[in-house]
Amino acid sequence: MTKKRKLESESNETSEPTEKQQQQCEKEDPEIRNVDNQRDDDEQVVEQDTLKEMHEEEAKGEDNIEAETSSGSGNQGNEDDDEEEPIEDLLEPFSKDQLLILLKEAAERHRDVANRIRIVADEDLVHRKIFVHGLGWDTKADSLIDAFKQYGEIEDCKCVVDKVSGQSKGYGFILFKSRSGARNALKQPQKKIGTRMTACQLASIGPVQGNPVVAPAQHFNPENVQRKIYVSNVSADIDPQKLLEFFSRFGEIEEGPLGLDKATGRPKGFALFVYRSLESAKKALEEPHKTFEGHVLHCHKANDGPKQVKQHQHNHNSHNQNSRYQRNDNNGYGAPGGHGHFIAGNNQAVQAFNPAIGQALTALLASQGAGLGLNQAFGQALLGTLGTASPGAVGGMPSGYGTQANISPGVYPGYGAQAGYQGGYQTQQPGQGGAGRGQHGAGYGGPYMGR
C-alpha cells in the first residue's frame, strides 16, 4: 500500500508542475508570445510580397499575350520579324530610281551620309578618268598633260600608241586625283591639242561610235540639229582655227569645226558648226554663200549636208537624162534605153499614121515619083510597112519590119539586087550593113535617094 501511495504521489508531482515552474513559465510566456507575433508578421509580409510578385508576373504575361495577338493578327505565319531581316535583302528588289531617291533623301537629312557619298565618288575612278579622242598621230603623253594640267592635278596619263610604229592611235586617257579636276575638264569637251581639234568624255561612258570628232553628241536632239550648220567647199589649206574665228562672228559656237581629217587635222572639203543658240545659226545662214580667204563657202542646215546634196544631184541628173530622152522621143525616139527601145520608138511613130495618110502618100508617089526615080511599087511597099504596124508591137521590134512586102530591085536603084529588106534585120545577109542604114532611113520617113 505504501508503495502505491508513493507511486501516485510521484505521478501527481510529474503531472502537476510545481509552483516555481508555473511562475517561471508565466515569466517566459510574454517573450515567447512576442517572438511568435514577430514570426507571424514576417510570414504575412513575405506572403504579401509573393502575392504582389505573382500579380505583377501575371499582369506582364497578359500584356505580352495582348501584344503578340495584336502584332501577330496581321502577320500570322511569319517566323522572322522585319527588324531581323537583313537590310540588303530589303533593298535588292528596289529599282535604280528607288535607290537613288532613298539615297538622296538620306543624304539631305543626314550630312554624314552625304559626306560618305562624296568620299566614295572621289575614290572611284569612274568620276576621275576621262577619255580623249581625235588626237594626231604625233601626239605624246606630255602633250596631253600640258593640255589638261590646268584643270587639276593629274594622277596618271596614257597616250595609246601602235606597238609597231610607235605612233599614236588617236586616243588616250587622263586620270585626275580629284573629281573636281575631271569636272572642270569636261566643261569644255572639245580642245585643240597640237593641230587637231579633239574631244573628251568620261571613260565610263564607253567607246565612241562613228566619227570621233562628232561623237560627243551622244544622243539625237532635234534642237542640236536646228543649231548645226554644214559648210561645204572648205579647202584643205584653210586653217581650222581661222575658220572657227570667222564663223564665231555670227554667235557663240558650242562645237566646231567638226569633220576634220583624222590624220592631218585639216578640212576634208566640209565642216560642221554647232551654235549655242538657234538665233546664231539662223544669222549664219542668212547669207548662204560666204567668201573666206579667196574661197566661196556654201552654208546649209546640217540636215542639208552631203548626203542630201548628193541625192539632189542624183535626182537632178536623172531628170536631165529623162528630159533628153523625152526630147528625142518627140523626134521619133522612144523611151530611154538600148537600140531596141529606140526601134520601139519608131514603131510608136508608125502608129501615128493611119491608112488614109498611107493612101495619100501612095497617090503622091504615083503622080510625082517619076521625077524622083521612084515607082508606084515603092509607095505600096511603104504603105504596107506603115499600115500593118500593130499597136501590140510597142516596146519591141516594129511589126512593119517583119511583115513588109519584098521590094524589087527596081524600087531602090542604089541597092540593086540586095535582099536587105527581105525579112527585115533578121534575114540580112553578111556584109550588107548598108541595108541597116537604109532601113533606118525608111523608118524615119525619108526614102533613100541613092548615091
Curated annotation (Swiss-Prot):
Q: Which Pfam family is one of this chain's hits?
A: RRM_1
Give the tissue specificity: Expressed in shoot meristem and flowers.
Sequence ranges of Basic and acidic residues compositional bias: 25-38, 49-63
Q: Where is the RRM domain?
A: 128-236, 227-314
Supply one GO molecular-function term. mRNA binding
Q: Where in the cell is it found?
A: Nucleus
Return the Gly residues bias intervals: 431-451
Q: Enumerate the SUPFAM superfamilies for this protein.
A: RNA-binding domain, RBD
- Taxonomy, superkingdom: Eukaryota
Q: Keywords assigned by UniProt?
A: Nucleus, Repeat, RNA-binding
List, alphabetically, the InterPro entries matched: Nucleotide-bd_a/b_plait_sf (IPR012677), RBD_domain_sf (IPR035979), RRM_dom (IPR000504)
Predominant place of localization: nucleus
Purpose of the protein: Heterogeneous nuclear ribonucleoprotein (hnRNP)-like protein that acts as a component of a complex regulating the turnover of mRNAs in the nucleus. Binds with high affinity to RNA molecules that contain U-rich sequences in 3'-UTRs. May function in complex with UBP1 and contribute to the stabilization of mRNAs in the nucleus.
The name under which this protein is listed is: UBP1-associated protein 2B
**What organism does this protein naturally occur in?**
Arabidopsis thaliana
